């Protein structure tokens, strides 16, 4: 019996609320494309400042790890 395989990909997500919300946005985007998500690793985070709009944009770069379906 072969143990299940795993794959990963990276993506960037944003939120005007906070980093937690940005991670939730990343999860919501990822689950539209893959299933069997096992973990989300935060690789980088920063805040983009939009002074002209008096706004902060929270950004996260994450790695999404998911299980490959067995046939």
Regions found by a protein language model. Give the residues of each.
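Generic short beta-strand segments
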Residues: 43-47
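Acidic pyrophosphate-coordinating catalytic loop
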Residues: 48-55
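Short connector loops at helix/strand junctions that flank enzyme active sites
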Residues: 6, 37, 55-61
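Short, well-ordered alpha-helical segments
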Residues: 2-40
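C-terminal edge-of-domain segments
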Residues: 57-71
